[in-house]
Amino acid sequence: MILQNKTFDLNPNDIAGLELVCQTLRNRILEVVSANGGHLSSSLGAVELIVGMHALFDCQKNPFIFDTSHQAYAHKLLTGRFESFSTLRQFQGLSGFTKPSESAYDYFIAGHSSTSVSIGVGVAKAFRLKQTLGMPIALLGDGSISAGIFYEALNELGDRKYPMIMILNDNEMSISTPIGALSKALSQLMKGPFYQSFRSKVKKILSTLPESVNYLASRFEESFKLITPGVFFEELGINYIGPINGHDLGTIIETLKLAKELKEPVLIHAQTLKGKGYKIAEGRYEKWHGVGPFDLDTGLSKKSKSATLSPTEAYSNTLLELAKKDEKIVGVTAAMPSGTGLDKLIDAYPLRFFDVAIAEQHALTSSSAMAKEGFKPFVSIYSTFLQRAYDSIVHDACISSLPIKLAIDRAGIVGEDGETHQGLLDVSYLRSIPNMVIFAPRDNETLKNAVYFANEHDSSPCAFRYPRGSFALKEGVFEPSGFVLGRSELLKKEGEILLIGYGNGVGRAHLVQLALKEKNIECALLDLRFLKPLDHNLSAIIAPYQKLYVFSDNYKLGGVASAILEFLSEQNILKPVKSFEITDEFIMHGNTALVEKSLGLDTESLTDAILKDLGQER
């Protein structure tokens, strides 16, 4: 039954049978994620909710919309992908997120947070116009309710009364910040005269009871607080049901039946346990959110820790070192304190470093205001999430030339998370903005120098980028040097052709340089360093070389080679330039080395391409 491509085979009246299905799903998730890595604890925690959804609804008539969709593994297993699930996050295998091109049962692409309700509103509007039966059903995590788009969608949904079911999966992972902030806003309701008077009267009554039952006084206030979120949603015109036990299938089924009958917008508040069913992961929220391969029995990682610091660690260590000396340094991250390395700074200086939750636009705008007040804000953010704050960069930082510092992590190809998470766009869109300074380090040592430069640069916004995992260039190959605004660095002068690397592209170019040397072809190597402004001496630097080859981890359109070609055109210089950047397509998931090879960006393919361009055979 469960292995078939039919969701209606799940009998909502057979709770015991559904519980067995849940156990089967959990076992399969654990088996595959322990081997491949992936988003474990959120997927384990959402199993009963997803089984309940499939038991009651046909997801092709009632589109299931998974917010972020990293918790949708059970959905994949229930929709014909039980066996192929072994290829999860592997090159040319199943995506770790919902993906319509993978399955007709995946309604919408997902990967970024907080979009599900907005998508659902669009579906509901379309269904109303087409007079289509059915309603969208969105499963969203607690972290997603901190983003503005969630409230924008609720605003219209409550006003228009479109039929829609929202299931808020409250696993107390991301909810600590957003619900904490929401609770503060909602606490005004609890400070009102009704609540205060009612509480006072009940406490007075309870105080007359024997001490053995006086514990009810404290339980009363806790229970009354549960009403508050409901009041908030009801005031917006959204029916609220909950909180319910998100692991009790009987309760889930009955609640979904009720929500289905209402034919109005409904939010079901379900409380779940992240990592449910795997004792080692239960309650250890952040550690088991996203994992690499691990031993099922011990929970220990199968990968040994690298002796070399990751770029993220090199960045955060350097920023911490500077923050100890400079009280003007502050920092912001948008719900990624651990991923960006800002967690250690938040722990050390909680009044100066902030996790603002999933609110990238707010992160950039508030940082711009801090810069105006004389502080030095470092915004630590993944490349893929920075694009969510583009207007804030333009409107709030760059127009006024406020010196925020964008530390762009996960730049380039990121591997198993795929097209929704690749860090390939930042170069193209940032270089189009006036007043923005853009530069990139080539290794951990120059990354430290990049942080130093950003800290001292006070005349405009600046941005520097670095990759996930490690740089392509090994430590110590070239002596590190400090950054000087608009200056490149010629690492090797000899040769008839010039390899130009930007950021992590320097390491890629260096590997090609070594491969070509084995073919008796000497190549010069330039670390471009600054993309904006370009080195004003670039025309003199490139003059001795017959051809230029450009290496960088970003899209070719509007990328590094484009900037160089624009410069050459303005200088009336004719020089052959070939770009080894990313072509105009969304890049799929998989092991980074395999993905790069498929794109012709591995050392062997790049070497062959240059040999061919030079008219030589390998």
Curated annotation (Swiss-Prot):
GO molecular function terms listed in the Swiss-Prot or TrEMBL record? 1-deoxy-D-xylulose-5-phosphate synthase activity; magnesium ion binding; thiamine pyrophosphate binding
Give the note describing cofactor binding and stoichiometry.
Answer: Binds 1 Mg(2+) ion per subunit. Binds 1 thiamine pyrophosphate per subunit.
Pathway note: Metabolic intermediate biosynthesis; 1-deoxy-D-xylulose 5-phosphate biosynthesis; 1-deoxy-D-xylulose 5-phosphate from D-glyceraldehyde 3-phosphate and pyruvate: step 1/1
One GO term under biological process is:
terpenoid biosynthetic process
Its cofactor is: Mg(2+); thiamine diphosphate
Positions with a binding annotation for thiamine diphosphate = H70, G111, H112, S113, G143, S144, N171, Y278, E360
Catalysed conversion reaction? D-glyceraldehyde 3-phosphate + pyruvate + H(+) = 1-deoxy-D-xylulose 5-phosphate + CO2
One short Pfam name that applies is DXP_synthase_N
Name the keywords, alphabetized.
Answer: Isoprene biosynthesis, Magnesium, Metal-binding, Thiamine biosynthesis, Thiamine pyrophosphate, Transferase
**Gene3D superfamilies referenced in this protein's UniProt entry, alphabetically:** 3.40.50.920, 3.40.50.970
InterPro entries the record matches: Dxylulose-5-P_synthase, THDP-binding, Transketo_C/PFOR_II, Transketolase-like_Pyr-bd, Transketolase_BS, Transketolase_C, Transketolase_CS
Q: What class of enzyme is it?
A: transferase
SMART domains recorded: Transket_pyr
What are its E.C. numbers?
2.2.1.7
Tell me which GO cellular component terms the UniProt record holds. cytosol
What HAMAP family does the database record attribute to this sequence?
DXP_synth
Family named by the database record: Belongs to the transketolase family. DXPS subfamily.
Assembly and interactions?
A: Homodimer.
Any idea what job this protein has?
A: Catalyzes the acyloin condensation reaction between C atoms 2 and 3 of pyruvate and glyceraldehyde 3-phosphate to yield 1-deoxy-D-xylulose-5-phosphate (DXP).
Q: Any idea what this protein is called? A: 1-deoxy-D-xylulose-5-phosphate synthase
